[in-house]
């Protein structure tokens, strides 16, 4: 699977800094991204798939800058992204046409046939000619996932993939992800979906607050959230809680273990 490397990445939106000197090397087959809204999770995924370019620094795939010719080709062939909102991603009016979009090397008729065969294999033959506009939000999200699966990139970037799904939909997606042989980089607020991952990054206002094994990083983030809630409910205890928060950060900082990145 590809090696993704972010070197001294800076990103600003307007006057708001998103990342300042971000350094990461992403090699594990399962990587979770957690943190509050606005922490930088979606921005990181958009940088990795080339939808945004850093103001400073570089992003490489297997040693090639993704914004140079060789790296751009590698990125387009090896990285796919599923957006949080499927309406930001879907282009075509029917399911089969949307799936065929992920097969650019084939003639239209061949691509549509492969899309129909793929849907049939998954018991969804009746979806082929369904109008996207007739699908629920969760069903449209499932179409985006199926399009990625059929296209077959080596690395899948998933931004809040469970957000629009009902419980059966979440179970189906989790089953697919568990069986996948691709590299998965998953941003989520549902920590149980990444808790067992070999690597989880906790982002906080564009900084890597913690970087390590899934169980440890998820537990540290949950403890931090509990402290924030308790502090809001009992302001008089804030000094004690602030001290506890500092001890949590010390136990799980981004540099607290042999780093995964250079």
Where are the model-predicted features located?
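Helix-to-loop junction immediately C-terminal to a conserved catalytic motif
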Residues: 49
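Catalytic Walker B motif of ABC-type/P-loop ATPase nucleotide-binding domains
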Residues: 156-160
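Conserved ABC ATPase signature
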Residues: 131-135
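Conserved structural motif at the start of ABC-family nucleotide-binding domains
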Residues: 4, 18-21
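ABC ATPase NBD coupling module
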Residues: 65-80, 105
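Conserved ABC ATPase "signature" region
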Residues: 109-127
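Conserved beta-strand-loop-alpha-helix hinge in the C-terminal portion
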Residues: 207-230
């Amino acid at each position: 699977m590809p090696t993704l490397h972010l070197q001294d990445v800076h990103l600003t939106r307007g006057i708001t800094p998103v990342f300042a000197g971000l350094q990461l090397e992403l090699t594990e087959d399962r990587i979770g991204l957690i943190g509050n809204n606005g922490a930088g999770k979606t921005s990181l995924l958009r940088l990795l798939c080339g939808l945004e370019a850093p103001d400073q620094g570089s992003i490489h795939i297997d040693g090639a800058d993704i914004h140079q010719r060789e790296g751009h080709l590698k990125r387009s062939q090896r990285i796919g992204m599923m957006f949080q909102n499927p309406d930001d991603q879907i282009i075509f009016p029917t399911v089969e046409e949307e799936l065929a979009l992920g097969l650019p090397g084939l003639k239209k008729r061949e691509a549509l046939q492969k899309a129909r065969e793929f849907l049939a294999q998954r018991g969804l033959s009746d979806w082929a000619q369904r109008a996207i506009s007739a699908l629920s939000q969760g069903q449209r999200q499932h179409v985006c996932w199926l399009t990625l699966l059929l296209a077959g990139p080596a690395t899948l970037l998933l931004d809040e993939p469970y957000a629009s799904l009902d419980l059966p939909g979440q179970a189906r997606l989790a089953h697919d992800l568990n069986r996948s042989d691709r590299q998965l980089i998953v941003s989520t607020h549902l920590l149980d979906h990444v808790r067992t991952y070999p690597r989880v990054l906790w982002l906080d206002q564009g900084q890597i607050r913690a970087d390590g094994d899934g169980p440890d990083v998820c537990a540290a983030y949950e403890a931090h959230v509990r402290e924030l809630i308790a502090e809001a409910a009992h302001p008089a205890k804030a000094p004690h809680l602030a001290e506890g928060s500092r001890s949590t950060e010390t136990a799980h900082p981004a540099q607290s273990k042999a780093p995964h990145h250079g």
